[in-house]
Amino acid sequence: MASRAGPRATGSDGSDFQHREKVAGHYKMSASLKNEIKKLIYAHLIIWMLIAAQMCVSHLKLVSKDLVAMPYQWEYPYLLSLVPSLFGLFSFPRNNISYLVISMISTGLFSIGPLIYGTLEMFPMAQQLYRHGKAYRFIFGFSAISVMYLVMVVAVQVHGWQIYYSKKLLDSWFTNTQEKKKK
């Protein structure tokens, strides 16, 4: 062993630390999954702010109806999708399993559910746009159906990955908890 002031111990070249300085795999995985989920939550926050801005602009009549269409019915319950993301963020500091489970279930209910309903709600108008090339709602000159379907595709991917990574994180925390209980 080396001392602060003295010479290095004989037979040691300083590379004998690798067997001692390892972080357990489940801690690495937990940290990386938390990081991925946080990125997805921030992406969800951007989508949420875009939808909220569109709703505010149309309801407050800040611009004409020709520029920003009135919101669809699925957009109102989708605004509640911020709550599951907050539960997910609150679960991270102390590895709170119950908050993460609440986040996963309510993400399906408040995020994926309205998106599925929105797909069904807008399908007849999308069909009309495809068949006849006529759109009646616009967002800054683009067909509102096309814009909202694009937003929905991105949102479904974000929420799907969020649920997937949350499940993997939950499994990681749960196996770690079970190992502690066995000891």
Swiss-Prot record:
GO terms for cellular component: endoplasmic reticulum; endoplasmic reticulum membrane. Residues 1-39, 93-99, 159-183 are cytoplasmic. The chain crosses the membrane at residues 40-60, 72-92, 100-120, 138-158. Keywords: Endoplasmic reticulum, Immunity, Membrane, Protein transport, Transmembrane, Transmembrane helix, Transport. Its main location: endoplasmic reticulum. Endoplasmic reticulum transmembrane protein involved in vesicle-mediated transport, which is required for neutrophil function. Belongs to the jagunal family. This is Protein jagunal homolog 1. It comes from Xenopus laevis (African clawed frog). The gene is jagn1.
